[in-house]
């Protein structure tokens, strides 16, 4: 059993799914030949030992079940069965002492040099990759090719970049293949403290109402494991009516697909059927886009399913594609977002890093609530000083910045605000975050950003964050979101 798993995995990287090769370090799948052979030999020897341990455990458990008392000794057979089952489970849990389990030999993961550097050092080596160099629709069609009709598709969305990671063509192709789509709203742990799961769920339903019929929506956190019980429940229900035992996990680059699968696998390990049957390794995850290069299949016996992780679909509308890989990681929150509330009038302009400029051109006093990474600075300055601040401070006080010369374009936003207590609309910049607008009366904003970066106006996700006690009254200051202090220029 274990040996067959090793043989299946020996040709492919267990972290990113690419095929191993020993020739060119600049191409995906490179692993030194001696390292590959030594690890493979170690795993083959270890598998024999693990099989013997597993066989002995099964014999002990079977012998214990044979000692179960006769039903005739009990007046009520229902209570007899319940007591016996509980006793067997307790005995099976303690069948292997912890110190013996810890002394078991361990199988070593076989991963490529790229995955090794990502997981050990947090570095992203630049290697040639076929699928990520293709247009998004071409990549999407290639990912969907092996998916059978009426399969289950888990579509993972980055909730912090909902519009940037939502690819409508996924729903179109899924309808053609009559797939059952479950929309996974990942990274709820990055939302502010007062975010309510029920409100997020209903918001997700409303935003996708016109894209797909009978869509299941599940808000989850791959980091904390919150929300996974609903996903497992849906998968169990669908498994009985689905001809294909494979569940395909799709999503845009950096939406958290691999992290989602790793957490799902851990949750399934807690089920009795999955005990001592963990996969050989976890999928490689990182803060860099495009970590997974080829499809990877993981078996979950407790669900009687196989989970297939697919390469991230490139969405060229995200602002991160116009930044260096190092600066792109600054836009990915690694802790809860703390909303920044600023007052807006036509006299002032706002910079989000050196990436986006927002100016109010008409209307009365409004609140702007910024939902962006804590590593991205927000600067409020007078309108006549905005360009000078950019020329002097891009990449310094205003961070991050674009990694190339770009063509700027303007987007006009007209909003009729209807409440001082609740945001009316969100201004969304793909790959960056969003800004909620709160107040009374009509107003117009002009948003300056890089050409081809995605932009949306939507219903507010977090509409109640513009509270008076959160307002930062600043003039000519920068909010350094990394430390949440007001720092003078």
Which residues are covered by each model-predicted region?
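RNA pseudouridine synthases
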Residues: 187, 201, 367-370
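Generic enzyme active-site microenvironment
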Residues: 156, 184, 307
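Canonical P-loop GTPase G-domain recognition
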Residues: 179-182, 190-255, 261-274, 278-281, ...
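Histidine-anchored nucleotide/phosphate-binding helix
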Residues: 166-178
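Conserved Switch II/interswitch segment of TRAFAC-class P-loop GTPases
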Residues: 120-123, 148-167, 188-196, 225, ...
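Loop/turn segments within WD40 beta-propeller blades
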Residues: 158, 242, 300-302
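Helix-rich effector regions associated with P-loop NTPase G domains
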Residues: 3-152, 180, 276-489
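Well-ordered, non-membrane alpha-helical segments in soluble/globular domains
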Residues: 136-139, 167-169, 196-204
